């Protein structure tokens, strides 16, 4: 049991560094609600296997080894072979950035993207994740792929990224109902100020939602051309679903 607890604490530390970026041992201890000496021991062990590295200012950060691990994991997703070309065409035709994300335990993980002209303003990248309640990909997956959305909502109020992030159970529940009714999600500055997106579910041959395709850019442009972008994303989704048919 002690070994399991140590591994659980190590995973929590890794998840915290992935979500928040470099942290001091004191910040990590407070965030994870574990003693600071425990953080030091975990960091030393993870550094020994090149998963965490200490920075010159004594903060802890994920090592560059995670980039290789993420790339290996991405290449292992053989069901998405050929998805890159589809995303490239979508990004080229709309000039927005296209993301393919899959559901995981804590949120939507980006496995592929095609960069638009405004990529510098976006938070999501391949290998990164966003929680289920924020962003077009996360919320469409929460509505249509999460095994128990009500249980997720029981954790509200949830972390806020901007003033537009929905953090209360009531507003999120209404949003999920709207997503199910119209078939896609709309993100309007709920992750990054000035950024919007639309997100659509991608289904396998059995009809199960296995991923989300989202298109993101400046909020004003996404809002002004929403119908056009939804139609373009829908066409790309149809192509992606052929890969899994």
Give the location of each predicted region.
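Acidic surface patches and DE-rich sequence motifs
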Residues: 55, 104, 204
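Short, structured helix-loop boundary elements
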Residues: 3-7, 63, 76, 80, ...
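Extended hydrophobic
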Residues: 165-239
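N-terminal helix-turn-helix
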Residues: 1-76, 80, 238, 242-243
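Amphipathic alpha-helical regulatory segments at dimerization interfaces
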Residues: 16, 31, 84-93, 99, ...
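Cysteine/selenocysteine-centered motifs that mediate thiol-based redox chemistry or coordinate metal-sulfur cofactors
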Residues: 142, 151-160, 237-245
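Amphipathic alpha-helical effector-binding/dimerization core
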Residues: 58-156
